[in-house]
UniProtKB/Swiss-Prot annotation:
Presence of keyword Disulfide bond: no
PANTHER family in the cross-refs: ANTITOXIN PARD (PTHR36582:SF2)
Organism: Yersinia pestis
SUPFAM superfamilies, alphabetized: Ribbon-helix-helix (SSF47598)
Any one GO MF annotation of this record: toxin sequestering activity
Record-stated family: Belongs to the ParD antitoxin family.
Single biological process term from Gene Ontology: regulation of DNA-templated transcription
Record-given protein name: Antitoxin ParD
Keyword Signal: no
């Protein structure tokens, strides 16, 4: 369900939104803002995924192998 909201944009963002509409990429301000919010939501989901992976990694024992050894092993594992 749509919700009417009022936003205040500075000159720079107002100009940018206008350029996006003039380019024909978007039909109106609402389309620009919806796309921007979808991109922001996707970025936040990626950031949260990375945070979750980091937290999961804190429970893994520390490896004393050098990075070169780890990379070499990874290359061998993926060689066909």
């Amino acid at each position: 369900m749509a919700h009417v909201t009022s936003v205040t944009l500075g000159e720079h963002l107002t100009g940018f939104v206008g350029e996006m509409i003039q380019s024909g990429r978007y039909g109106n301000i609402s389309e620009v803002l919806r796309d921007a919010l979808r991109l922001m939501e996707a970025r936040e989901q990626r950031v949260q995924h990375v945070r979750d992976m980091v937290l999961a990694g804190t429970n893994v024992p520390v490896s004393h192998r050098l990075m070169d050894e780890i990379f070499s092993a990874a290359v061998k594992d993926t060689s066909v």
